[in-house]
A protein has these predicted regions:
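C-terminal regulatory/oligomerization modules of transcriptional regulators
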Residues: 1-9, 64, 69, 86-128
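N-terminal helix-turn-helix DNA-binding core of bacterial DNA-binding proteins
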Residues: 8-54, 81, 89, 112-116
Length: 128
């Protein structure tokens, strides 16, 4: 897949980063792929509020930007798996930090914390 054209008029690296990993579901997709390769339906179960269309669009953009790779197996029914590239995996400390920040925010503001949907089998530094 061909890389997307990014319009980085300001030259700001934060702007580029957010244009690549920003989006409603991209950070969650990346976070869940830290654990292991996942099939499309596994991702839809882990991100239940995302429509299949939106999930497909965000997966395509992540693939075009070189953060994930899509493996298609010649089977019936078709089997497709997604996994992080080395470049995508380099986001791990950022994604773990986002999770930790969110957990602190939830705790400080009396919000429920769902370990079930966000655990993804990824150990945080505080859990180790």
């Amino acid at each position: 897949m061909r890389p997307r054209r990014l319009d980085n008029k300001s030259g700001c690296a934060v702007e580029v980063t957010l244009s690549i990993i920003g989006g409603v579901w991209k950070p969650l997709i990346l976070f869940h792929l830290l654990e292991k390769k996942l099939r499309f339906m596994q991702l839809t179960r882990r991100i239940p509020n995302a429509t299949q269309r939106m999930l497909t669009l965000q997966l395509r953009e992540l693939e075009a930007d070189g953060l994930i790779v899509r493996h298609v197996f010649p089977e019936v029914p078709p089997k497709v798996e997604y996994e992080l590239t080395d470049y995508g995996r380099s986001l791990e400390p950022i994604l773990i930090s986002l999770r930790q920040w969110g957990e602190g925010y939830q705790r400080d503001h009396g919000m429920a914390v769902s370990q079930r949907l966000c655990a993804a089998g990824v150990e945080t530094a505080s859990a180790a």
